[in-house]
């Protein structure tokens, strides 16, 4: 009897790493693989991954950026402990292949995989590669990127996506039956985006009620009460929610999206084919959100507006002066920029390396 092959997926810290990792993990499981997940205790991945049915393997490690001199001084000891714990996981799980999708946890896991002679596959989600993936790409057997040129020897395949984003109707079909006010979706992410929560209600208040878009605004749990107060103060009606369960459908139903520019958000919007105003988080590491947004904006698939330039007046003018037909054009251009087979490409590489 042939035993199923085993993969150790490594991704952590943010949804931008975790959800592409889940897409790959689910694809491998569908092909008959056993999948274990290397992460850190008390993290986002520790809450999201186990309910999906994957064995969670915790090790103690976190980033050092902005943590102060004391944390930096202890880095060698913390790294040594993380290496030891990761080595124990690799020896116990005995994966046929190790797949890293970003986050600090992938560094000790990836290095110990190489030490143990395990094939290593790396995928970089952002247009500006993170430090960990820059290092691991030098020792990996296969390297993939979501954006062209992010890693020197990386093959551009796009971002691993959940199937819901690749199964939406094309923009022409979605826009064909639409009429009336524009449908505006504002997405702040799991933590919310205070700048969007403050400015969007003010912008909508500047638009005459009869021309105002129909608005759905997602804020994150911590900011939902403040968001309700902002809309009430502006005298604007909107559907307000802390989370969106079906993001793919929400993207598809919107005429225009206002959002941050994390890698997953940008590539999911492109896969669906939707027009967006991207407002990059100004404190993102290496300003990678600006580079992510520029990928679509430069192709005519959306607008790039820096947070320092975002004002209620400018946003109101854009919303009033943009017709649905123009948004369809941008949605179509966004759609042409996204590769949708990254999940399959990464899974194929795993199988080729273990054939």
Curated annotation (Swiss-Prot):
It catalyses: di-trans,octa-cis-undecaprenyl diphospho-N-acetyl-alpha-D-muramoyl-L-alanyl-D-glutamyl-meso-2,6-diaminopimeloyl-D-alanyl-D-alanine + UDP-N-acetyl-alpha-D-glucosamine = di-trans,octa-cis-undecaprenyl diphospho-[N-acetyl-alpha-D-glucosaminyl-(1->4)]-N-acetyl-alpha-D-muramoyl-L-alanyl-D-glutamyl-meso-2,6-diaminopimeloyl-D-alanyl-D-alanine + UDP + H(+). Its main location: membrane. GO terms for cellular component: plasma membrane. UDP-N-acetyl-alpha-D-glucosamine binds at residues 14-16, 126, 162, 190, 244, 289. It comes from the Bacteria. Its EC number is 2.4.1.227. GO terms for biological process: carbohydrate metabolic process; cell division; cell wall organization; lipid glycosylation; peptidoglycan biosynthetic process; regulation of cell shape. PANTHER family: GLYCOSYLTRANSFERASE (PTHR21015:SF22), UDP-N-ACETYLGLUCOSAMINE--N-ACETYLMURAMYL-(PENTAPEPTIDE) PYROPHOSPHORYL-UNDECAPRENOL N-ACETYLGLUCOSAMINE TRANSFERASE 1 (PTHR21015). InterPro entries: GlcNAc_MurG, Glyco_trans_28_C, GlycoTrans_28_N. The gene is murG. Pfam families: Glyco_tran_28_C (PF04101), Glyco_transf_28 (PF03033). HAMAP family: MurG. The lineage of its organism: Bacteria, Pseudomonadati, Pseudomonadota, Betaproteobacteria, Burkholderiales. This is UDP-N-acetylglucosamine--N-acetylmuramyl-(pentapeptide) pyrophosphoryl-undecaprenol N-acetylglucosamine transferase. Keywords: Cell cycle, Cell division, Cell inner membrane, Cell membrane, Cell shape, Cell wall biogenesis/degradation, Glycosyltransferase, Membrane, Peptidoglycan synthesis, Transferase.
């Amino acid at each position: 009897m042939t035993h199923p092959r085993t993969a150790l997926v490594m991704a952590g810290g943010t949804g931008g790493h975790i959800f592409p990792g889940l897409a790959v993990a689910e694809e491998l499981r569908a092909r008959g693989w056993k999948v274990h997940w290397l992460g850190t205790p008390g993290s986002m991945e520790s809450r999201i991954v186990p309910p999906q049915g994957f064995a969670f393997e915790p090790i103690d490690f976190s980033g050092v950026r902005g943590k102060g001199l004391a944390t930096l001084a202890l880095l060698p000891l913390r790294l040594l402990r993380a290496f030891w714990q990761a080595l124990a996981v690799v020896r116990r799980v005995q994966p046929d292949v190790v797949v890293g999708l970003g986050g600090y946890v992938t560094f000790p896991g990836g290095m110990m995989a190489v030490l143990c002679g395990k094939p290593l596959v790396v995928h970089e989600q952002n247009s500006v590669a993170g430090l960990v993936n820059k290092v691991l790409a030098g020792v990996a057997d296969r390297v993939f990127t979501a954006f062209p040129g992010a890693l020197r020897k990386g093959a551009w395949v796009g971002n691993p996506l959940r199937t819901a984003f690749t199964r939406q109707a094309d923009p022409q079909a979605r826009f064909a039956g639409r009429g009336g006010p524009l449908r505006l979706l504002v997405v702040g992410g799991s933590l919310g985006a205070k700048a969007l929560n403050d400015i969007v209600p003010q912008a909508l208040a500047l638009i005459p009620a009869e021309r105002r878009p129909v608005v759905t605004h997602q804020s994150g749990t911590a900011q939902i009460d403040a968001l309700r107060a902002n809309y009430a103060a502006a005298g604007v009606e909107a559907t307000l929610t802390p989370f969106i369960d079906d993001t793919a459908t929400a993207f598809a139903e919107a005429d225009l999206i206002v959002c941050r520019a994390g890698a997953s958000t940008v590539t999911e919007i492109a896969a669906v084919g939707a027009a967006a105003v991207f407002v990059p988080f100004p404190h993102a590491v290496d300003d990678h959100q600006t580079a992510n947004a520029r990928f679509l904006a430069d192709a005519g698939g959306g607008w790039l507006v820096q947070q320092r330039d975002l004002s209620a007046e400018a946003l109101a003018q854009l919303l009033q002066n943009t017709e649905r037909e123009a948004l369809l054009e941008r949605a179509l251009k966004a759609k042409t920029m996204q590769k949708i087979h990254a999940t399959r490409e990464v899974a194929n590489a795993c199988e080729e390396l273990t054939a």
